[in-house]
Amino acid sequence: MKILIVSKCPTHPTDAGNRWWILSQAEMLISMGHEVHFLYINELPLKRNAAPYIESLEQTRKYWGDKFHLFTVSKFQKYKMIAAKLYRMKFGHNYWKVDDQYPFGLEQMVNELDGTIHFDVCIINY
């Protein structure tokens, strides 16, 4: 089977539990003979030093090679998501709609990848 794993969390360096889980999941699926691709949702921080994020991105890209796909959240989109978060906190009693933090354009990219590669399974990780 062709499998797409989608995550905002890079797989490398494997120095946190969620990264370890995603990589272990991928390696298990690969060991079973499946073709596994990784779509990384890149959301750079606005105020923090971006160097560690860029380093993680490069290490993840290197590991996955041609099975690596990148979706980058624009700064405008990031500000929009922050505004929605602040609005929900102030006026919505922290009630969130399911798509409040869903990056615009991600669905289109997944559909384009699926149209080209024809995935059988799509796994979404945190």
Residue spans for each PLM region:
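Residues that line or immediately flank small-molecule/substrate-binding pockets and catalytic motifs
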Residues: 7, 43, 72-75, 126
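N-terminal subdomain of nucleotide-sugar transferases
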Residues: 1-68, 115-116
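Extended hydrophobic/Leu-rich segments
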Residues: 64, 68-70, 76-79
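Conserved nucleotide-sugar donor-binding subdomain of glycosyltransferases
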Residues: 74-126
